[in-house]
Amino acid sequence: RLRRPSVKNRYFSVDWLGMGSSVLSWKLVDHPKLPKGKTVAVVVLDGWGEANPDKYNCIHTARTPTMDSLKTGAPEKWRLVRAHGTAVGLPTEDDMGNSEVGHNALGAGRIYAQGAKLVDLALASGKIYDGEGFKYIQECFEKGTLHLIGLLSDGGVHSRLDQLQLLLKGASEHGAKRIRVHVLTDGRDVIDGTSVGFVETLENDLANLRQKGVDAQIASGGGRMFVTMDRYENDWDVVKRGWDAQVLGEAPNKFHSAVEAVKKLREVPKANDQYLPPFVIVDENGQAVGPIVDGDAVVTFNFRADRMVMLAKALEYENFDKFDRVRFPKIRYAGMLQYDGELKLPSHYLVSPPEIERTSGEYLVHNGIRTFACSETVKFGHVTFFWNGNRSGCFDPKLEEYVEIPSDVGITFNVQPKMKALEIGEKARDAILSGKFDQVRVNIPNGDMVGHTGDVEATVVACEAADRAVKMILDAIEHVGGIYLVTADHGNAEDMVKRNKSGQPLLDKQGNVQILTSHTLQPVPVAIGGPGLAPGVRFRNDLPNGGLANVAATFINLHGFEAPADYETTLIEVVDN
């Protein structure tokens, strides 16, 4: 046998030993029935699920002729897939999908245990306390304070209260003598107004720790969208407000207890848990009870990465110019997980992240597929970093182009609900018409970002703008004889109201419907078509429980290749006419 040259990449080194050897190859097998060379548009509508039609289903209410035509025009080329729970690696069927795990599944073509599940396993087994990350922060327990910063909620999208409770218990049992919690109120992944109950629950837990001799209390707080939890460097002032309260112990609002703080701040007209201003807890002398100082340990306990990265940079980077930190305490900092594998950020973490290798993007680049990916700032990371298995940057800059359109800053998205949908559509259209790319991949964020505001009218406008962007892309595909695949990452805009078990809208004490600002458990559509789609291609009917992870094999087929053997099964079949 001839010995072939070694192929090296960042995951492994493989020696080709000829036929019959069980080595892993990047080379994809040609599909027996589907041609190569067609331009494929992959469109992800963020927060676009399928639900019963009523006035709180903004997708149904909106004028969306393009998406409507995909649903009704070709029944064998439109179906629903699961985008929540175990289908995307989350622990239970009650776990809403989110954009991170959704894009991981779409890009990876396989289901990986995700953040929350990894943390659950580490806490349940106690392995979290044996890991390098915990041992790193544990060295501060004797003389310093352990600070825990994160979202106080049981929403399960960024964090979970029960995980914080277990971490508090475990840390105190492993030597933490002084603990300060810096809480961020939710109102986005859970109902607005629930912050008071979560704070009361936490205060009760901390009181129990104090009875056991641990000096434990809440030190600061604020609403998640106004304090700390910005993402993609959209607005560093959000992080600075958190830094001032958490590290410097400074905020415009000072209270003697967190329950008092949240109750008082919610009395302001139109107050919302998401946007509560920063506050610090002070003692009887007016001194902050828990600023972060030299010798302390800090843990950010969110398991989801995107809204922790900016704070992680502020806590970890010696050279930092995004705002004046005033002082940079010498601390030991660990994330619940590593939030960015490429930046190695943070450098210490309590639970190792899912190792996602051999994503569809990497396979396609190895097979010469020229790729264009685009979204606006708020979802750019999803169509690149998360799609590529939590990996920053291109696999091959010669074959890939990633374009980020700056998102609006300084406003909530219901003020400009069209966002940058048309600009994304234009960029995708131009990329398709240029002939330079084989795959054009976009995320259109409107349904999710505006849906999160709870503004029903604005969300309708958002869905209409998204539909127009899809039309621009599909028109370009028509022009070049290409193929489209349109899907979504999870639900949101299709159900904007909290419901009882029989599906009726829930009312508050004043008789108003309770608006739902979170994601949903609804399935999402997948539609295929275009003049380049080979005759006889249709969705299979033997995969009723198909999920987002099945989509990767599907578009790999549309490029004219068989998917890797370990990928979730393709959604399509080719029937001989």
Regions found by a protein language model. Give the residues of each.
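Feature captures the catalytic ectodomains and active-site-proximal regions of enzymes
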Residues: 10-577
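Basic polycationic patches enriched in arginine
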Residues: 1-4, 10
